[in-house]
Amino acid sequence: MALLQISEPGLSAAPHQRRLAAGIDLGTTNSLVATVRSGQAETLADHEGRHLLPSVVHYQQQGHSVGYDARTNAALDTANTISSVKRLMGRSLADIQQRYPHLPYQFQASENGLPMIETAAGLLNPVRVSADILKALAARATEALAGELDGVVITVPAYFDDAQRQGTKDAARLAGLHVLRLLNEPTAAAIAYGLDSGQEGVIAVYDLGGGTFDISILRLSRGVFEVLATGGDSALGGDDFDHLLADYIREQADIPDRSDNRVQRELLDAAIAAKIALSDADSVTVNVAGWQGEISREQFNELIAPLVKRTLLACRRALKDAGVEADEVLEVVMVGGSTRVPLVRERVGEFFGRPPLTSIDPDKVVAIGAAIQADILVGNKPDSEMLLLDVIPLSLGLETMGGLVEKVIPRNTTIPVARAQDFTTFKDGQTAMSIHVMQGERELVQDCRSLARFALRGIPALPAGGAHIRVTFQVDADGLLSVTAMEKSTGVEASIQVKPSYGLTDSEIASMIKDSMSYAEQDVKARMLAEQKVEAARVLESLHGALAADAALLSAAERQVIDNAAAHLSEVAQGDDVDAIEQAIKNVDKQTQDFAARRMDQSVRRALKGHSVDEV
């Protein structure tokens, strides 16, 4: 009998047969695609040898162009040339108009308030535009590898929220790609450097791209990549350098009109060219809208210094979160084209006390890391022992009685992760429970962020505390959160996948963490008070039910003592004296002990009525 050749699920049946995978850096300004060939990760170039693909799409009635061809139309047809679409991903129209009031596009709101861009090809959302960029990258990879891709790893900023990550997945699906995983950009950079050097210790990944800034503090140990802490700014990058310089040129050239989109694009192009030139030269001559002038590196540095300082403040916060000092960081990895700016490299080197790593092209390092990970996930390296442990930036939890937040998954927990906690009903006969998912570090609901609400219905009508509900939080490798609530005895359950329409900015995250530290003592006291008030309400609710059912077991004098104790508890529970409430609860318990014993005896007698001793 011939033997059947078998293989691990998801792997090729033939040991020598490689599956085709690619890593995609879907950037704000530029995008890249990379793959692993002959054991080496490399980015793939177009027919003209260019590795970067500008993240720009130009739309016409009969089609569209992507990349360099699209970018040439930016100044001529601004309204139909979409660039930096990554900034729009997962955001509401109101949010976009507030953050980016000078975008040269016409928007309409969809039924759910999400942005639709008016183009010659019709109304398009950011997901569709991103899909067109991904299609162009996939076509480049398919041609270079002479075959269809089996899967891709796409990188996203560490601070992308659920809606932005889901939008990226939707764009890939629209482009016909199978997403193996979304990978945080700093983690991808750690893969690119860590695998080559095999170095162990703490590494900082400073990622300043076109539209986002991320700082990650990583620990590399025995093949394990663990993100100790993350920080950054989802609305800060080289684009902001460009806009600052463009505004400066506008002032120097005395161009007051901001409504002319063509002039605005010309100014931006001039600013970008000047920024690049100033990385090597001390000064550069600029020609725009009939004006000619000179800009020095010193002037440029003065313009961008406040933004660079903002990135270093985020670095300091991330180090504090990670519990490490700057001098403990062995290496600083530079990622993103904006890290070529001399002032950035200089200030980062001063902050960490060592020159940053730039041996891998900062534009390519993320795509290379994604390609290495894709090669593993597609099954080409089944023996790889590399692990990736990303973290969640803010704690996740539930609202409980009294307006308290019960944390289920603490901040900086590595993902993927699943945690569960058991809860119970508060009132007799309660058949439904509202599940309120919270995010934040404070103790009270009012001080945290609401993520989602859903209801679990069909709970058996039992006495208070009789039903047991298990609530499970699951965060997958892409940072998407699913919450499931299940009543144990019946198996009835309800769940929700959290997809906020738009997420927190880095400053809001930093503010929430800072507030949790500033108000720590106050929050603990507030929580203790709320817990005692909830317990007081539970005791009074239970006592009232018992008195309604079995008041006949008490004499008038005994009833008066219990009523007085209950009235006192009800009164002090309205105040904010934790000790007084606790003592009043103990007093009610003391005064009702005999009553509770009589009720128990009566229940036993009722249960035994009509039965002989032998039957018992």
From Swiss-Prot:
Protein source organism: Shigella boydii serotype 18 (strain CDC 3083-94 / BS512)
InterPro entries linked: ATPase_NBD, Heat_shock_70_CS, HscA_NBD, HSP70_C_sf, HSP70_peptide-bd_sf, Hsp_70_fam, ISC_FeS_clus_asmbl_HscA
Pfam families, alphabetized: HSP70
GO function term, MF aspect, one: ATP hydrolysis activity
HAMAP family: HscA
Keyword Transmembrane: no
Keywords: ATP-binding, Chaperone, Nucleotide-binding
Name recorded for this polypeptide: Chaperone protein HscA
UniProt record similarity statement: Belongs to the heat shock protein 70 family.
Protein's gene: hscA
Stated role: Chaperone involved in the maturation of iron-sulfur cluster-containing proteins. Has a low intrinsic ATPase activity which is markedly stimulated by HscB. Involved in the maturation of IscU.
GO biological process: iron-sulfur cluster assembly
